[in-house]
UniProtKB/Swiss-Prot annotation:
Gene: ppp1r37
SUPFAM superfamilies in UniProt: RNI-like
Signal peptide bounds: none
Tagged with keyword Nucleus: no
Originating species: Danio rerio
Biased composition range(s): Polar residues: 791-801, 811-837
Protein name listed in UniProt: Protein phosphatase 1 regulatory subunit 37
Gene Ontology MF: a single term: protein phosphatase inhibitor activity
SMART domains: LRR_RI
Family affiliation: Belongs to the PPP1R37 family.
The organism's place on the tree of life at top rank: Eukaryota
Biased composition regions of type Basic and acidic residues, renumbered to the chain: 641-658
Keyword annotations: Coiled coil, Leucine-rich repeat, Protein phosphatase inhibitor, Repeat
Functional note: May inhibit phosphatase activity of protein phosphatase 1 (PP1) complexes.
Length: 919
């Protein structure tokens, strides 16, 4: 067979093997002769495809026919790189031109072909191929990048045209293989690329959690009962009669019901599972599971339900000794996850070493739990250490009960002391019936010193304390500002311990309740406690039962009640103690009765004080100024009786004007300062309260401040047919504290806004001129209510007028200026003319007649002055020779100041003299 036939058969064989047209095609004449430059390596996918093509061309007897084809001649197709080996080609980053050639019958000296693949004809004339060396063919295939499919030129030693017998890769494969060598080398060295979708495409979907209370909407009691019965039937357990009855009694299913009481019921796992039909539809305030014989499975199921459905705010799991580790783990998960649980009672439920870490981890996270009962839970040692460490960071727990846990005085007490140093949120710490001892009390007191605003109640009942430990407690009490209840009952404190404790109790100002029951006290200790009672202004309750307190101690306690007004309850033994003298027994009974009466008295005082505080709070919320009708009704009710007495006192005082002083003030009913508060006012001196007994018209002292009063004011009322009251203004004559002083104090209360009260101080005229004024007063009609006093014509008349002007408030000055209208000014002019023409006595008579006419004219007109004052007030103060009313005093002061006097100095002197003369 010649070379031409073999080449034709090779092309047919490739076509029969379903080689695609993209792999083998006829090249152009130029491509047959010249090698193609710039040929790129194929990618990995193309290599696999080409390897599959070669595999389909293999025969089963490759190795046996290889030698035969070498002897008979073969067509060798080689694709050797020009510049180097296959290894050099892989490492090179620069593309090298490839030269491919096809030689027929070129065999080396050793009889082997220098290509990777041999194509030969077997005995039957079937074209076969076999790699000369399998390893060489694999290396050639990988290094040359499938050179058989790349640009291949077949050289034939024949005279036939080259274009009819050439095999080449078509030009369409060149762009596909034109990938940079750098990227191909990077992929081959294992550099992979990972891409992620955009943020919007990452989450393909979401599922909302199921609503735990989806079954509780529009549900009825019958539906709940039916669901519970069906659950019991499905679980093959009997319905609990107590559950059926309590469910039947449910009223409002939209709110939390009071209680689900399962106390004493034996709950196994199936019974607990059936309760889910109740919990998923109804919520409760308290779920009582006390002594229900819960095991690990049942407890876990119930706690998971309560956590998921938030079934309870208060949970009682006490007296369940078989909850186990899984039960406590579920309970801890419930405490950590639920937001509704506030109270957990786990007394008499063991919390052992392997369960304590779960509870500690739950308490470290600030959950909603505020009250935790762990009495008799066996938490001494490591469990207490874990709990105390966790509670240092807890911010919500308020009450911690650790009674009857056999806490010792070393390690456990040290943990409690450290807890008190760091946690300022615990308000109640109950350590009763433990073994704290005096050594442990020292640790607790170290932490107690840091509790300046946290701990309120500390119970150390029955902790084997003695008088030695009271020293630590007495040293800590002055530092505690929040401790209100201290219970030291059933400890051997003794008289010596009470003496040590007394100083600390007196220094402490926060203790309200003190428990000293059964502390081995006698009369000596009772005397020390009595000293504390007398010094304490806040103590409310004291328990001294089961102590040998006899006559001497009871006498000291009884005397202490004469000073103390705060102690409301003192617990003592009802029966008197045995005495050697029989009469002392009756004395003890009498003293006990006195102590009881003292408690009752303090209780009444406390109740009155509380009512007073309530009234003060109410008055603070009311309007500052009441309506005139309301105040008028209050005036008629409260002041009916004092008015008559005021009139009588005023009549007597007018007859003896030389030694009596007048006081113009509002009339108000005296009040008990301890039981009735004073109303608020707008006075600038609300805080100045100096009660003085200056009025003789009332049964109890009326509080009158030195400068301005804050007491209740009464608006003006219609004139009463009395010589003492005109237009709501009351004139009260009272004796002054210093009778030697000729001054007179007039207190005027304005019924307008602000309840202003001002003082007017005057100096009396000499006695001879006052007698003349009294004679003139008798000639005036009784209806004219005036106090006529002739002032001296010397400096004594000018100085009090200046004082009165200095003492007046702006409201009073405004009233005076308004009152200086035509009646008063006309009177002044007429009086001036009379002094020039008539004698002194005729002048006095004329002034008296003119003033009387002015009073009648003002009474007829009744034109009120500002703040409700009527013009009668303008005629209230005038004396003998010239009118001396407040208005005329204002005019005279102005005239005197124009003569060169300094106004500021006069006001200062007037205020100083007023402060001395005023009561």
């Amino acid at each position: 067979m010649n070379c031409e036939d073999q080449a034709v058969d090779l092309c047919k064989a490739i076509d029969l093997c379903n080689v695609s047209d993209n792999t083998i095609s006829h090249p152009t004449p130029a491509e047959e002769i010249l090698p193609r430059d710039g040929l790129q390596l194929m990618d990995g996918d193309q290599e696999e495809q080409d390897a599959a093509v070669l595999t389909r061309l293999k025969d089963v007897h490759l190795k046996d026919d290889a030698l035969h084809t070498k002897n008979n001649g073969s067509i060798a197709v080689s694709a050797d790189p020009v510049n180097g080996s296959a290894g050099d080609l892989q490492q090179s980053t620069v593309e090298e031109p490839l030269a491919t050639k096809c030689s027929v019958g070129d065999v080396g000296d050793d009889g082997e072909m220098d290509i990777g693949v041999d194509l030969s004809l077997d005995e039957n004339g079937v074209l076969e191929f076999e790699p000369t060396a399998q390893t060489q063919s694999e290396e050639s295939a990988s290094s040359c990048e499938n050179s058989l499919i790349s640009d291949t030129v077949i050289e034939l030693h024949s005279q036939e045209p080259l274009e009819e017998h050439s095999v080449d890769v078509p030009s369409e494969t060149v762009p596909a293989a034109a990938t940079p060598v750098v990227e191909e080398a990077g992929i081959k060295h294992g550099l992979k690329r990972v891409t992620f979708p955009s943020d919007e495409d990452i989450v393909s979907g979401a599922v909302e959690p199921k609503d735990p209370w989806r079954h509780a909407q529009n549900v009825t009691v019958e539906e709940i009962l039916n669901a519970y019965r069906q659950a019991c039937q499905k679980l093959n357990c009997k319905p609990i009669p107590k559950v059926l009855k309590q469910t039947q009694d449910l009223k409002d299913l939209t709110q939390r019901n009071e209680c689900l009481d399962l106390k004493g019921e034996k709950l196994d796992y199936k019974s607990c599972e059936s309760l889910e039909e109740i919990f998923k539809r109804v919520q409760f305030k308290l779920v009582d599971l006390e002594q229900t014989n819960l095991d690990e499975d049942g407890a876990s199921a119930l706690f998971d339900m309560i956590e998921y459905y938030e079934s309870a705010t208060h949970l009682n799991i006490s007296n369940n000794k078989h909850i186990g580790t899984r039960g406590w783990q579920a309970a801890a998960h419930m405490m950590r996850k639920t937001n509704s649980l506030q109270y957990l009672d786990a007394r008499n439920t063991p919390l052992l070493d392997h369960s304590a870490p779960f509870v500690a981890r739950a308490l470290r996270i600030s959950s909603s739990l505020t009250v935790l009962h762990l009495e008799n839970s066996g938490i001494s040692g490591r469990p207490l250490m874990l709990l105390a460490t966790a509670l240092k960071m807890n911010m919500n727990l308020r009450e911690l009960y650790l009674a009857e846990n056999k806490l010792n005085g070393l390690q456990d007490s040290a943990q409690l002391g450290n807890l008190l140093k760091f946690n300022y949120n615990i308000q109640i710490l109950d350590l009763r019936n433990n073994h704290i001892l005096d050594s442990g009390l020292a640790y607790v007191c170290e932490g107690l010193k840091e509790q300046r605003k946290g701990l309120v109640t500390l119970v150390l009942w029955n902790n084997q304390l003695t008088h030695n430990g009271m020293g630590y407690l007495a040293a800590a009490l002055p530092f505690t500002q929040s401790l209100e209840t201290l219970n030291l009952g059933h400890n051997a404190v003794g008289n010596e311990g009470v003496h040590k404790l007394k100083d600390g109790l007196i220094s402490n100002r926060s203790i309200l309740r003190l428990g000293l029951a059964s502390t081995k006290l006698s009369c000596e200790g009772a005397v020390a406690i009595a000293e504390f009672i007398a010094e304490s202004p806040r103590l409310l309750r004291l328990d001294m039962r089961e102590n040998e307190i006899k006559t001497g101690g009871l006498m000291a306690l009884s005397l202490a009640f004469k000073v103390n007004t705060s102690l409301l309850r003192l617990d003592l033994d009802r029966e008197p103690k045995k005495e050697t003298v029989k009469s002392f027994i009756e004395t003890q009974r009498a003293l006990l009765a006195d102590i009881q009466n003292g408690c009752k008295r303090n209780f009444i005082l406390a109740r009155e004080k509380e009512e007073t505080e309530q009234k003060m709070r109410l008055s603070a919320s009311m309007a500052e100024i009441a309506t005139e009708d309301q105040t008028h009704e209050e005036e008629e009710e409260e002041e009916a009786s004092p008015l008559k007495k005021i009139e009588e006192e005023t009549t007597d005082a007018l007859k003896d004007a030389t030694q009596e002083s007048s006081e113009v003030s509002e009339n108000q009913e005296p009040k008990d300062q301890e039981s009735t508060p004073q109303d608020d006012s707008d006075s600038d001196t609300e805080d100045e309260e100096t009660p003085t007994n200056t009025s003789l018209t009332s049964t109890s002292p009326i509080p009158i401040p030195a400068a301005a009063d804050t007491s209740k004011t009464i608006p003006s009322t219609p004139p009463i047919a009395s010589p003492a009251v005109i237009s709501g203004i009351t004139v009260t004559e009272a004796s002054i504290v210093t009778p030697s002083s000729p001054g007179r104090c007039i207190s005027v209360s304005s019924p307008g806004r602000g309840h202003k009260i001002f003082m007017v101080t005057r100096v009396e005229s000499p006695p001879e001129q006052q007698q003349t004024s009294i004679a003139m007063l008798k000639s005036i009609q009784p209806s004219a209510i005036t106090d006529i006093k002739a002032p001296s014509q010397t400096q004594n008349s000018t100085q009090p007028t200046e004082k009165s002007h200095a003492e007046k408030t702006p409201d009073a000055q405004q009233e005076d200026s308004v009152s200086t209208s035509t009646p008063s000014l006309d009177a002044n002019i007429d009086q001036t003319q009379l002094t020039e023409s008539v004698s002194e006595e005729e002048q006095k008579k004329a002034e008296t007649l003119n003033n009387e006419a002015d009073i009648n004219e003002d009474a007829n007109t009744g034109a009120p002055l500002p703040n409700g004052l009527k013009p009668e007030f303008a005629l209230f103060e005038f004396e003998g020779a010239k009118p001396a009313s407040c208005i005329m005093e204002h005019v005279s002061v102005t005239a005197e100041l124009s003569c060169g006097q300094d106004l500021e100095e006069l006001l200062l002197d007037a205020s100083l003299e007023t402060s001395r003369d005023a009561p």
